[in-house]
Amino acid sequence: MVHLLKSESTALRESICAVIAGKDCYQADTLSLLSGVKIISRFGTGIDNIDLRAAQQSGIVVNNAVGINSNAVAEFIIGLIFASMRNIPGSYHAMQNGYWGESHGCELQGKRIGLVGYGNIGKTLAKRLSGFDVELLAFDKQPDYQVADKAGVQFVSIEDIFMQSHVIIVLLPFSSELENFISHKYLSMMRNGALIINAARGKLLDEGALLQVIEERNVFAALDVFSSEPLAQFSPLLHAKNIITTPHIAAATVES
């Protein structure tokens, strides 16, 4: 969208009064081209891809559609859980290379799931996971105990999330204060065989620390978001053992 806006004529750009924004970045240089725009509405929750200060200076209102893609992301995360725990991508590639053999994965039933963040997506995901007979833990700086109790979710410390969970799911909103919040300190606490999933924002997770921990220990990761997107073809994340990667598609469904 941003690329198209920059390529259009000045007259056409000036005729635009509202923008429905996706994942593209709307920085000051882009906003300066949109003199007629009065509002940018983010199709999703996070608005970290929009320069809010520049928007304010330009008199542009920024809002978001909270919860609109919660189900899409929740379902995708469940897909990543099974893809990793049952080694579905690895088995597919093995067959493509002529290898027929068993891959002994793990079942989800009875596992402990840790949600790092319990907002709209976390609550939807907890509801979807409740049918799998799992134990649900959550960490949130503003815990909603009433909703959590009804969903069978127990709030614990972030340290307990990483030490106790078989599957850890990062669901925090991004802010500059939370860059690399999921650091080596927490990643090194993961239990043997644990899986961490990030479908929130790439910059929440210290990717270098993740690579180090995966190299040293038997832990797994499934990543839909990255600190820099699109992910470079030479990125070690693409070639590291025990990591599944997808190109930021968790929210991308026809319905959402």
Annotate each language-model stretch with its function.
Residues 91-124, 133:
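Glycine-rich NAD(P)-binding loop of Rossmann-like domains
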Residues 140:
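Conserved acidic E/D residue at the C-terminus of a beta-strand in Rossmann-like folds
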Residues 21-23, 44, 170-172, 199-200, ...:
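Glycine-rich, N-terminal phosphate-binding loop of Rossmann-like dinucleotide-binding domains
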Residues 56, 63-76, 229-256:
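C-terminal helix-to-coil terminal segments
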Residues 37, 109-112, 184, 193:
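Phosphate-coordination loops involved in phosphoryl transfer and adenosine-cofactor binding
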Residues 17-92:
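Phosphate/diphosphate ligand-binding glycine-rich loop within oxidoreductases
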Residues 1-18:
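N-terminal glycine-/charge-rich "phosphate-binding" loop or analogous flexible N-terminal tail
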